[in-house]
Amino acid sequence: MISLFRYMREALMRGVQVVVGTALFDVWPLLSLRHAILRLYFQAGAGFLVGRHFQFHRPHFLRAPAGARLTFAQNVKINSNVEIDYSGGVEIADDVWISQNVIIETHEHVIGSGPKSGWLVKWFPLEIGRDAWIGANAIILPGVKRIGARAIVGAAAVVSREVLDGEIVGGVPARMIGQRPAEREGE
């Protein structure tokens, strides 16, 4: 019975996301309705904005950790065509920007000798720190535990390791290419 409930809830969440993610919801007052509906499903703070054609989902949700959630703090901005797999849980802090076409994955398949349907699935929680910016077309791979506060992930980067606070990374695989200047008091 619990599995049926989880299945129906996931199906409803995906269906609602498809509907509110269309261009129709890009006009006011429907844009406000999009954000209100998403707040019903996900913990989202004030200033939460999301573009069209997004997808927040939990593949293998029947086997995924029950406590895995997707949470958004204050002033999180998510552009169009973003896919966030929150099977392992994703926590997004204040003032984070996620640019268009970003893919965030929090699960992986452990390749075995038998049929694919029998392979194990591993989940990894992810935290995106305050004031981080994920550039367009970036991919965050499973196993990355944290994108640090004030970190910047460059466009088209493939992140396979933790990004430290204030670090600027880019490339495939992503590596440090710079450091954000220290925050000044009052900024």
Locations of the language-model features?
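Terminal amphipathic alpha-helical/low-complexity segments used for targeting or macromolecular assembly
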Residues: 1-47, 95, 108-110, 131, ...
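Conserved SAM-binding loop
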Residues: 82, 111-113
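A short acidic, glycine-rich active-site loop
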Residues: 116-126
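Metal-dependent phosphoesterase signature
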Residues: 62
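Left-handed beta-helix
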Residues: 51-52, 57-58, 68, 73-74, ...
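Conserved catalytic-core motifs of eukaryotic protein kinase domains, centered on the activation segment
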Residues: 115-116, 144, 180
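Short linear capping/connector segments at secondary-structure termini
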Residues: 59, 114-117
